[in-house]
Amino acid sequence: MKIKLLMTVIFIISLSTMLMDWFGGQRGVQDISGLILLNNPIAVACIILTLIGIWTHYGETSYMLIYVGLTGIMMMEIYEFLTWHILTISGSFNLALSFDWCNPEFYIAVMSMIATLLIYRYYFQKMDLTKSQDYV
């Protein structure tokens, strides 16, 4: 139970980076926070998959749910990075605009999600996933 709580706290800390301003021109004027990610139903489904994977006792299946969930969240963060400006500023895909108006907090969010995935992979490699048991 302690491990599951610790894994949940690590995941919530990683998700808390969505509260930061990811995109925008001038600070405080045109900021778009990472909560824009929650407008994407795939990202919400990936968050739910990760939480289900943490709190179930299915060994390999739990690992796969967490892995798919965290990878999906990272992919949706990159998708938002590439497309956030289409509806708000430019009206078309522009990679240069994505890089120019991206705040460092976005990169912090992506790196924290990668770190979370690496922590989970390290933990699951240390245990025997062939057993369907509680991993606490």
Predicted regions and their residues:
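Compact integral membrane and secretory-pathway proteins
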Residues: 1-136
